[in-house]
A protein has these predicted regions:
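Short aromatic-glycine motifs in intrinsically disordered, low-complexity regions
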Residues: 694-702
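Bacterial Sec-dependent N-terminal signal peptides
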Residues: 1-25
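Accessory carbohydrate-recognition regions in carbohydrate-active enzymes
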Residues: 25-358, 362-405, 411-470, 481-505, ...
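Hydrophobic, small-residue-rich alpha-helical packing segments that form membrane-like cores
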Residues: 471-475
């Protein structure tokens, strides 16, 4: 008995020790940058690459398994690396711009991307947000990278070899390389891009070594050349030296979209620090931002998934500005090609990110979001339009006019502290809402129809017309909200309120679903609610019917009341995952991801329906929200390379998880409200920018105890199915009483439901 007690005590001590060790880890230690990299064009488990970067950094770095120009720059299943790429890629579908690659090698000179490629193993790979290391087996070289916002330091550990080399590949589409041996330096530029750039676009780079060059070469495409300078379609440079076994060579790299001189200035970010110091500074930067949210009382897998999602939420939009010789903020404009003062951000698609990412930044990083808003004002002044998908300039992708949501939500939640030009931004919103742009994804395609008859018709040659109508109506609501806050004329306010009800024009009373409508007022026929595309964007009617973020009560009324509405929500999950792909001529990856998820018509891998599980709160059935949100978190997310259920999309799908883990979600950006879900952890602490804290306590939380029995805020019973942003940012203590049995009486009264325009007084 004594021995048994002793053994039990020892085991308990070990458990406590391991728990302490786990809890002692810092937030960045839980991050896995490889989440989402096990992807391909036909099946996205994230479509990410390991971004070795600072939060919102101007430049990212990634190991490169894909070929030059391949949007799938790094795929987990690959077994060879072709180089280490400076990248600005937001998505494989958008591809990259301003990229160039670096690759060390030994022995016979092999500079083309296939010849220089080396086998590698994930077993000899270390991947952190602030640090990357890998062993290149074919060259017997260990390569390490640690970044700053605009620069990076490489550490190469070579074997003994007479012919150790480093290749700098400036890639094709117009590039230049110059080797300067006396300065141990390579400079150059790349113009490679995927669109959305002015004619004078260049990314200027400088690379400085700590070792003299013994050999130098340049190349043009596959042709090796003598000489130190080359300007051609596809330029590159090679420097070589003898190395001893274990010899370390350091290279410092920086770049600029402005000039060579600015690239040299950007090297200042590295200063005189050694590699390990830069690495530790990077680690500290990530811990500072990730540490703004502290989670306790979950398992290690949940910690890893949470912080990996939080990491992805802190990468985009990227900083597209630099600091001049006087420390002033300047930027190269991707809209007019000029160098101008002020902030600029890019690489985000508002169709994705207005939903959760930007509301998350408004809550946790409002100062950064104020800079982003200034950047949007600059974008409008420089290009005449707000970017709906910027990478780096205007790109013709997706639908909607969702810059309105991004601008309005930022001002409405943090307007009292804003220092940016809201007057210019409001002007930009009005301009975008009433004009078709130079691209169909800018301004509003079909705006004349929409403003005249209240919808974009199905039969006038404008694709995805129902999706456009629904998104325009919501965007008009956000303009209405902003117009009220800015005390605009009553006539103007009422105009956008009226337009925000245009969603009703597409509601089909027969099917109780949204449906494309012809110019003559008749619904399009035949109608297949399972048909993807056509009247909708990357989805079908079962997905887009819920895109009435601002007036869920109005939608419920159209369906016949709250019970009928809740039953329709139930159908999304109970229907089989059938589909009609005929619009696309084949099964696109978003369809396949819905099909394999086994959640009916719920397609969490794509954005239009991600808010839908929270809508039960508007019908007095909050427990169903709690069930389906937890199901989605548990089944659709992991911290592994296949950890997403579709494209991660620049922080949006990650921000959904982060918000949901907190226990609430911004169903309707442009209002003050977050709709309640179910917290994931037993304790979460949000440290706001001004030092105030939001404490979220759910001590009985567990896998089975996922239902909210009761909630108090600052000691007062809270029966409502929503939280106020204004109340939260004052500092708040939320105490959730969790249970394994649904509480079907809490939040059932209409006065407890979240905001709907139809209920506005």
């Amino acid at each position: 008995m004594i021995n048994q007690i002793s053994i039990k005590n020892q085991m308990l001590s070990l458990v406590l020790l391991f728990t302490w060790i786990a809890n002692a880890q810092e937030p960045v230690d839980y991050v896995n940058p490889l989440v989402g990299t096990d992807s391909k064009p036909s099946m996205s488990n994230g479509n990410t690459y390991p971004a070795i970067a600072m939060p919102w950094g101007m430049n990212f770095w990634t190991p490169q398994t894909g070929k030059m120009g391949d949007g799938w720059a790094y795929t987990y299943a690959a077994d060879k690396l072709r180089g280490f790429k400076q990248t600005h890629q937001p998505s494989p579908w958008m591809n990259d711009y301003g990229q160039f690659a670096i690759m060390p090698l030994t022995g016979k000179l092999r500079f083309t991307e296939d010849d220089r490629a080396s086998w590698f193993s994930h077993k000899s790979e270390i991947v952190k947000p602030y640090y990357y290391s890998v062993y290149l087996a074919d060259h017997d070289i260990t390569t390490e990278i640690t970044p700053t916002e605009r620069a990076a330091m490489f550490r190469f550990t070579f074997p003994e070899n007479e012919h150790s080399q480093i290749v700098l590949d400036a890639l094709d589409k117009g590039s230049y390389v110059k080797i300067i041996p006396d300065e141990r330096k390579i400079i150059g530029y790349t113009t490679k891009n995927s669109g959305g750039v002015p004619d004078n676009f260049k990314n200027y780079f400088v690379m400085v070594f700590d070792k003299d060059f013994e050999t130098t070469k340049t190349f043009s495409g596959e042709q090796l050349l003598e000489g130190l300078e080359i300007e051609t379609d596809h330029a590159g440079g090679i420097v070589g030296f003898k190395t001893k076994r274990g010899e370390v060579v350091i290279a410092k790299v920086a770049s600029s979209f402005i000039s060579y001189d600015q690239a040299e200035l950007n090297l200042r970010e590295l200063g005189n620090d050694d590699f390990n110091t830069i690495k530790e500074k990077g680690r500290a930067s990530w811990n500072k931002e990730l540490g703004r949210i502290k989670v306790e009382g979950g398992n290690v897998d949940q910690f890893r998934t949470f912080y990996s999602c939080l990491y992805r939420s802190l990468l985009f939009p990227r900083k597209f500005f630099e600091y001049d010789v006087n420390g002033k903020v300047v930027h190269y404009s991707p809209y007019n090609g000029k160098v101008l003062p002020g902030y600029m951000f890019t690489d985000t698609g508002f169709w994705d990110t207005f939903r959760a990412l930007f509301p998350f930044l408004n809550l946790m990083y409002p100062e950064l979001n104020s800079q982003i808003q200034e950047g949007l004002a600059n974008a409008y002044k420089e290009g005449g339009w707000l970017p709906e998908w910027g990478s780096p300039g205007l790109r013709n992708v997706m639908v909607g006019n969702n810059s309105a949501s991004v601008v309005a939500d930022a001002y409405l939640k943090n307007g009292e502290t804003n220092t940016y030009d809201i007057a210019t931004l409001y002007e930009a919103l009005i301009h975008g809402a009433n004009n078709a742009g130079p691209l169909t994804a800018v301004g509003r395609a079909g705006v004349d129809y929409y403003n005249k008859i209240g919808y974009v018709p199905y039969d006038v040659g404008i694709n995805e017309n129902a999706a456009r109508t629904l998104e325009y109506a919501y965007d008009d609501f956000t303009i209405y909200q902003l117009a009220k806050a800015l005390n605009k004329p009553k006539k103007e306010i009422n105009l956008y309120k009226k337009r925000s009800l245009n969603y009703k024009n597409l509601f089909d009373p027969e099917t109780k679903l949204m449906r494309g409508k012809n110019e003559n007022g008749e619904f399009m026929a035949p109608f297949n609610p399972f048909k993807w595309g056509d009247a909708f964007t990357e989805g079908n009617s079962w997905h887009y019917t819920w895109s009435v973020f601002h007036d869920i009560q109005g939608l419920a009324d159209l369906m016949g009341g709250n019970e009928a509405f809740a039953n329709k929500l139930d159908e999304v999950f109970s229907l089989p995952p059938i589909f009609d792909e005929s619009y696309y001529g084949g099964v696109i990856h978003e369809i396949r991801e819905m099909q394999v998820a086994n959640m009916g018509q719920y397609a969490h891998g794509n954005q239009p329906i991600q808010h839908m599980p929270y809508l039960y709160n508007f019908a007095g059935q909050a427990w169903k929200t709690q069930y389906w949100v937890r199901e989605t978190m548990d089944r659709m997310y992991t911290a592994e390379p296949d950890g997403y259920c579709g494209d991660e999309d620049n922080g949006q799908t990650s921000a959904w998880y982060v918000f949901s883990a907190l226990g609430f979600y911004p169903v309707c950006p442009g209002t003050d409200q977050y709709v309640l879900g179910t917290p994931l952890f037993q304790k979460t602490t949000l440290i706001l920018e001004d030092g105030k804290e939001i404490s979220i306590n759910a001590p009985k939380n567990s896998t089975s105890n996922k239902y909210v029995n009761a909630l108090t805020i600052n000691g007062k019973v809270h029966s409502k199915n929503w939280l106020s942003h204004k109340e939260l940012i004052q500092g708040a203590i939320l105490n959730f009483d969790m249970t394994g049995t649904p509480n079907k009486t809490r939040g059932t009264n209409s006065e407890d439901f979240p905001f709907s325009l139809s209920n506005e007084k």
